[in-house]
């Protein structure tokens, strides 16, 4: 389990071919910004290998981001939306 208080992502991955973020009018850049704000992380109940991050973009937009944590702190963003 990651220590979320000291978590610093090494890199980000995203499937631009499926682009589930755009369906919610969220850009990949906005999703990444949320990882560098004050954030809260919970386990995703539906998928045990995924997490939910609630954070803010530089512009102040509050988003929920669904992601997987891969080896070496690589974050695979699945989707996200406004909350």
Residue ranges and their predicted role:
Residues 1-83:
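Ribonuclease/tRNase effector modules and their secretory precursors
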């Amino acid at each position: 389990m990651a220590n979320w208080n000291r978590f610093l992502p090494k890199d980000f991955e995203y499937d631009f071919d499926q682009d589930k973020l755009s369906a919610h009018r969220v850009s990949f850049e906005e999703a990444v910004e949320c990882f560098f704000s004050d954030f809260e992380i919970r386990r995703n109940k539906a998928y045990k290998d995924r997490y939910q991050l609630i954070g803010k973009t530089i512009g102040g937009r509050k988003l929920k981001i669904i992601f997987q944590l891969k080896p070496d702190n690589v974050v695979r963003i699945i989707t996200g939306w406004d909350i």
